[in-house]
From Swiss-Prot:
Listed GO CC annotations: cytoplasm
Assembly information from the UniProt record: Homodimer.
Chain sites annotated for binding S-adenosyl-L-methionine: 72, 103, 122-127
Gene coding for it: rlmH
Catalytic activity: pseudouridine(1915) in 23S rRNA + S-adenosyl-L-methionine = N(3)-methylpseudouridine(1915) in 23S rRNA + S-adenosyl-L-homocysteine + H(+)
Enzyme Commission number(s) of this protein: 2.1.1.177
Organism: Pasteurella multocida (strain Pm70)
Entry protein name: Ribosomal RNA large subunit methyltransferase H
Length: 155
């Protein structure tokens, strides 16, 4: 299974890139973890936010192909590390690739939310979108380590 993290926004701060890449490189070859960045639409005081969200959403969905889609969204389901590890096994056994979607400043388009089979909430807090990339990468790596009885995760 290949995991794709599809996120709105490019040109992230160096700490975001370094943090994401630290966990990305730890994933096993049989479970590659890829970041796909979708350019954010231009926002200004006269911007048509609905249209921008639709365009970003279309680009995100096009990048998903036939993979299982899971959105990262506050109203989604929160998982403990152990629950995420179980979920990771379910996704792996499904036989499809996995696309995780992170929206831009206004969130995800209605089309992305409708296409998702699941929605995952990292926290009831609103988190900065760049930080979410790092948190997702670490959380997935930790969940993988649980499934492999790797000593990274300690209870």
């Amino acid at each position: 299974m290949k995991i794709q993290l599809i996120a709105v926004g490019t040109k992230m701060p160096n700490w975001v890139t370094m943090g994401f890449e630290e966990y990305q490189r730890r994933f096993p070859k049989e479970m590659p973890f890829e970041l796909i960045e979708i350019p954010a639409g231009k926002r200004g005081k006269n911007a048509d936010i609905k249209r921008i969200l639709e365009q970003e959403g279309k680009a995100m969905l096009a990048a998903c192909g036939k993979s299982r889609i899971v959105t990262l969204d506050i109203p989604g389901k929160p998982w403990t590390t152990e629950q995420l590890a179980t979920q990771l096994e379910v996704w792996k056994n499904d036989g499809r690739d996995l696309s995780l979607l992170i929206g831009g400043p206004e969130g995800l388009s209605a089309e992305c939310k409708a296409a998702a089979e699941q929605s995952w909430s990292l926290s009831p807090l609103t988190l900065p979108h760049p930080l979410v990339r790092v948190v997702v990468a670490e959380s997935l790596y930790r969940a993988w380590s649980v499934t492999m009885n790797h000593p990274y995760h300690r209870e």
